[in-house]
């Protein structure tokens, strides 16, 4: 274990484009973020390409890049990562699919993706639904596993996914779903059939009856996507000599942590939404550094606000992240003496589009070892997309930035 501590903070999907509603500023530029600004001023700021060419802009690809793993070498699909975090061991013939509980709106005989989260269905409600699927649709070939809120898992044995095309439901908000239904291979018909059977079950499910009676959106369909086989990747200890932890409410981020050999810490009250337990994430993160070198703290709220298309919620999520996560961590790190901290989102999530986009993201960071150097051309008065771009510091891969981070942002 090193005495020097390394911390990465990830406000998922925080990066965005200028908005007329905010006077031409991005949400990050508009929000009050004194703690993140102080990091940019004390160290460096720049851009990093978290999404390699040819990869879809998702949190799986983004977090893998941030942690120093090249997705082009190690990524096999989103769902195997989520399976790992859920303790589901995949065999060599198993394919994992993400199963979203969603709300589909039918209008004039056409179906639209109305809500990718099934009205932010609760975990307890969702467990009841997944248990029904397990009893009525499950077996040795199709295995259903409950996750958190709307995010669940289906494992299918002996299915050909070569050429199978699926799309994330949060990337098709309010769009007609016909052209996005799983397709591209003979086996896609099996996947579509499971979706149809699940939809039939959900029509009269007791959970949905209660939600409708309470004026809530029903989870009236499922959406299968993110398929893949079990990946093979070196641990963080093997690749970079670090031992540490990951803290997130999101299964795929936990799964990356597991494959990286990091300890996955479950924080009570971590919801993956704006009501998450920010203080708990900081508390558990700082405690983890007593026995480790490194911690990755991931917060989903900024991403969820963007998917909902709500500027006010995104501003709140950014300011909450700055106050409770960035501020809390900077205070907590003081007791460790020497440390290096970096802050960056995993990808853009444009609140106007309600979906992820692949632009290079802004990062900022500083190290107690190097912050007292003479004024640095990569420092900035605050942390924003524009100033990060203007700094001229750019990394075309996560592994390059991660090594720079481990070198304490040493420019020598």
Segments predicted by a language model, with ranges:
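Feature captures the catalytic ectodomains and active-site-proximal regions of enzymes
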Residues: 1-412
């Amino acid at each position: 274990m090193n005495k020097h501590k390394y911390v990465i903070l990830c406000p998922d999907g925080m990066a965005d484009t200028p908005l007329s509603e905010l006077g031409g500023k991005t949400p990050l530029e508009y929000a009050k973020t004194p703690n993140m600004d102080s990091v940019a001023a004390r160290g460096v700021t720049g851009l990093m390409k978290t999404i390699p060419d040819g990869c879809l802009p998702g949190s799986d690809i983004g977090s893998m890049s941030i942690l120093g793993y090249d997705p082009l070498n190690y990524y096999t699909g989103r769902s195997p990562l989520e399976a790992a975090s859920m303790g589901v061991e995949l065999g060599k013939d198993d394919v994992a699919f993400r199963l979203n509980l969603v709300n589909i709106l039918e209008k004039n005989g056409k179906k639209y993706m109305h809500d990718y989260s099934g009205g932010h269905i609760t975990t307890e409600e969702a467990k009841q639904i997944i248990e029904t699927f397990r009893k009525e649709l499950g077996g040795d070939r199709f295995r259903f596993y409950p996750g958190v809120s709307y995010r669940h898992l289906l494992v299918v044995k002996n299915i050909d996914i070569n050429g199978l095309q699926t799309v994330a439901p949060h990337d098709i908000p309010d769009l007609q779903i016909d052209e996005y239904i799983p397709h591209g291979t003979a086996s896609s018909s099996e996947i579509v059939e499971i979706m149809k059977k699940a939809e039939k079950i959900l029509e009269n499910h007791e959970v949905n009856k209660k939600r409708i009676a309470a004026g809530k959106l029903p989870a009236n369909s499922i959406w299968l996507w993110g398929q893949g086989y079990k990946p093979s990747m070196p641990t963080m200890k093997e690749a970079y000599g670090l031992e540490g932890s990951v803290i997130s409410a999101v299964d795929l981020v936990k799964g990356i942590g597991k494959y990286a050999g990091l300890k996955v810490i479950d924080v009570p009250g971590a919801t993956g939404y704006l009501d998450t337990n920010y203080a708990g994430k900081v508390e558990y993160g700082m405690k983890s550094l007593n026995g480790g070198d490194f911690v990755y703290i991931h917060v989903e709220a900024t991403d969820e606000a963007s998917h909902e298309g709500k500027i006010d919620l995104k501003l709140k999520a950014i300011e909450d992240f700055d106050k409770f996560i960035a501020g809390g961590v900077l205070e907590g790190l003081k007791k460790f003496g020497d440390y290096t901290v970096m802050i960056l989102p995993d990808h853009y999530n444009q609140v106007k589009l309600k979906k992820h986009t692949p632009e290079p993201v802004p990062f900022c960071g500083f190290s107690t070892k190097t912050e007292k150097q003479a004024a640095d051309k990569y420092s900035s008065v605050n942390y924003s997309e524009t100033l990060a771009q203007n700094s001229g510091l750019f990394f075309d891969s996560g592994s390059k930035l991660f090594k720079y981070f481990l070198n304490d942002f040493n420019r020598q």
